[in-house]
Amino acid sequence: MYIVQIASECAPVIKAGGLGDVVYGLSRELEIRGNCVELILPKYDCMRYDHIWGLHEAYLNLWVPWFGAAIHCTVYCGWVHGRVCFFIEPHSEDNFFNRGCYYGCDDDDMRFAFFSKAALEFLHQSNKRPDIIHCHDWQTGLVPVMLYEIYKYHGMDTQRVCYTIHNFKHQGIGGVKTLWATGLNREAYYFQNDKLQDDFNPFALNYMKGGIVYSNAVTTVSPNHALEAQYTDVGCGLGHTLYQHKDKFSGILNGIDYDFWNPEIDRYIPYNYNQEDFEQKLYNKKALRERLLLQAADKPIIAYIGRLDNQKGVHLVHHAIYHSLNKGAQFVLLGSATEAGINAHFRHEKQFLNNNPDVHLELGFNEELSHLIYAGADMIVVPSNYEPCGLTQMIGLKYGTVPIVRGVGGLVNTVFDRDYDQNLPPEKRNGYVFYQSDNQALESAMNRAIDLWYQSPEKFQQLAIQGMKYDYSWNNPGKEYLDIYEWIKYKW
């Protein structure tokens, strides 16, 4: 099958968050399964050119219709760890992608409306006719709209679109200007509730809503998050639209790259290990203590790795530190905060706890240290307020680090409570789950984990090994996406 991914990010060249990892990981898996996969991306001035091999001008005269005229673009081609990537560079006074950043400009709505138009125009002018066009997040939400309202009438009538929503919080809001720029034009037609009209502002257009309405299949990043988006405020106002299109909407878990996150081959940890020689994990625990100057003691290490913000349940992260100490455990934190108040709070906590031999707070991010923490910790807490998919718990499971998670989003689909999950036999359970976003619920789950570590170390080790048996690579998601591609290719 011939698949084109259109996205605003692809790791490691363009990475602002998890989107880039997903686009790369899925593309790689689809190619491993024998498909032809190409990616279309903006040519940002600030992307990591050192990760592109053989970058060259591939299409010199791409003229993209824009506001009744046309903008000249050059399309470059290069290989990113074996993936064929096309990078679109517009030559205009707007300098859409020469801003020194990926996002955060006042005209982001127009920047990515243009990118969506340019991607389709490139496919059209170069006579590329993929079976599937896979778009990601609001930045490419207009691709299916323009495909079916404009390009279908120019010979692109067999392409089918899968649209994946990674983050409902950012939906892409435009207006009449978007319609006139892209050639969609008909205001009265698109400003309708069953088309692109924003549900909060009737005078605005919602790019993500357009992607939902016009795509042949819509996915988000976990089955439980798909339900939350339809029936709770997690959908950020798009719940009704998603429910109307529920027959084509589903959730597929993201995967993690086991070439990078795998204790058996991890180059960042001093002692490699797997399920059979799990005792090597204890040596990594010793190495972690030595690096972070924690005291050598017969205590479990509980970790938190991730952003320090409200989405991640920062108030519970704070409580987990002190509850761990009260329960006779050690605590390691590796995280960063962009919000000034949260950053100041944790800097104060770091200073206050500086002389405590059982805690270490590392503010910032350190790739190498994150691997050692996963390998050396006994448990990892993920107390998120909402979590579309979550990768931390998947990595923890692979490293035999028992996750303690709040039962939201993709955490529900990946962590199964040792004591209370009645849907799985005991040998399939792999962690601890709590549901309320309060200290008492967190404490209850942490207590059960810590008590098992102290009272039945053999059972705790068995729980950790059970978690290592789960496969959260891209293998299963790749198959599920191919099933969706086949479905929309032959149904529509």
From Swiss-Prot:
NCBIfam families: glgA, PRK00654.2-1, PRK00654.2-4. It catalyses: [(1->4)-alpha-D-glucosyl](n) + ADP-alpha-D-glucose = [(1->4)-alpha-D-glucosyl](n+1) + ADP + H(+). Keywords: Glycogen biosynthesis, Glycosyltransferase, Transferase. One of its GO terms (molecular function) is alpha-1,4-glucan glucosyltransferase (ADP-glucose donor) activity. InterPro entries: Glyco_trans_1 (IPR001296), GS/SS (IPR011835), Starch_synth_cat_dom (IPR013534). ADP-alpha-D-glucose binds at K15. Belongs to the glycosyltransferase 1 family. Bacterial/plant glycogen synthase subfamily. This is Glycogen synthase 1. It comes from Trichormus variabilis (strain ATCC 29413 / PCC 7937) (Anabaena variabilis). HAMAP family: Glycogen_synth. Its EC number is 2.4.1.21. Transmembrane segments: none annotated. The gene is glgA1. Pathway: Glycan biosynthesis; glycogen biosynthesis. One of its GO terms (biological process) is glycogen biosynthetic process. Pfam families: Glyco_transf_5 (PF08323), Glycos_transf_1 (PF00534). Synthesizes alpha-1,4-glucan chains using ADP-glucose.
